[in-house]
């Protein structure tokens, strides 16, 4: 018997994945130019165009996700989106690998405009899933993420880029950490 069957897991409902630094492999024109522009200012008015161009690098990842989970509810699984688990937890999938080169660990990028469009439903627990740790994100992006986390009462930020178990608090404001 397969482990998923023994645990009574449904791959369509119980599997949550986010893109990592090895997933953005589809060729994108001017990739380095877009990454440089975003590194200069990831929250600039022109940033959405660069993020959109870089999201094209995740076409193979998106195909993989849709092959594995045919009725995946999001058209573009590599974009920031929310999936609700069994009407109990909102998992916020964030693509923090959008500007990853596999070498540099700091000042990682994420399209915070996409995050701002996400509105978790109901009184469910909200958990962010990301590849890169919060501390590895660009400071300007961290600030925008903190605003969103504060508004939507995020309970946890789970990541796995560094392949180690670690617990770190994220100070949302002077009165609250997650």
Predicted segments, located by residue:
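Active-site flanking residues adjacent to catalytic metal/cofactor-binding acidic residues
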Residues: 1, 19-20, 130, 160
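Extended active-site neighborhood of metal-dependent phosphoesterases/phosphodiesterases
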Residues: 2-106, 148, 173
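His/acidic metal-ligating clusters that form di-metal
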Residues: 80-173
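Metal-dependent phosphoesterase/phosphodiesterase active-site architecture
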Residues: 175-178
